[in-house]
């Protein structure tokens, strides 16, 4: 799996995190079928600050994979159209070339996210399903998070403070920087 944490994503319309889900000859959704990272994506999207995400949403897609969306801070900006959208859950369309079955959704653990003017734990209120099929909402929710590996987890509010304090290029130069 992969962990994407403590990042500042700002002023993007088409570059918000896209969770790819399952790929490469996917064999179906079962407990035995996800032993290989080639079979299913496992992603931990945690402690990020999303700002001014344009016409889309904080992240999207995720077909067939297992994902955490935890303690992120969403602050809309002047170009943000959907001001309360945490995630847009995709599903496969069955188009030619897709390797996973039609109408395959991902599985998501969504918890502790903050959306400006909506407050703490906005979470599933900020999720839309691509095809509007709200009947799948309970089947795609994970009760427990995917193992994120070793990562320090902060509240969404603390994430906002820490990411703004440390994101971007620093002026401090160490010995490696000084050689250039």
Model-found features: residue ranges?
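Long, contiguous C-terminal flanking segments immediately downstream of a protein's structured core
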Residues: 70, 74-180
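Right-handed parallel beta-helix
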Residues: 1-19, 23-54, 66-78, 109-116
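Glycine-rich beta-solenoid repeat tracts in large extracellular/virion proteins
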Residues: 1, 15-23, 28-38, 56-63, ...
């Amino acid at each position: 799996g992969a962990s994407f944490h403590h990042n500042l994503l700002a002023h993007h319309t088409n570059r918000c995190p896209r969770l790819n889900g399952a790929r490469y000859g996917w064999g179906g959704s079962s407990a035995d079928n996800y032993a290989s990272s080639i079979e299913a994506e496992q992603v931990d999207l945690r402690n990020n600050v999303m700002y001014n995400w344009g016409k889309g949403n904080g992240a999207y897609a995720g077909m067939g994979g297992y994902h955490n969306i935890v303690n992120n801070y969403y602050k809309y900006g002047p170009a943000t159209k959907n001001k309360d959208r945490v995630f847009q859950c995709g599903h496969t369309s069955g188009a030619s070339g897709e390797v996973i079955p039609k109408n395959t959704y991902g599985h998501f653990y969504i918890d502790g996210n903050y959306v400006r003017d909506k407050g703490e734990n906005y979470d599933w209120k900020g999720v839309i399903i691509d095809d509007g099929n709200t009947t799948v909402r309970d089947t795609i929710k994970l009760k427990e998070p995917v193992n994120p590996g070793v990562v320090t987890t902060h509240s969404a509010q603390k994430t906002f403070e820490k990411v703004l304090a440390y994101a971007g290029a620093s002026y401090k130069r160490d010995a490696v920087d000084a050689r250039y």
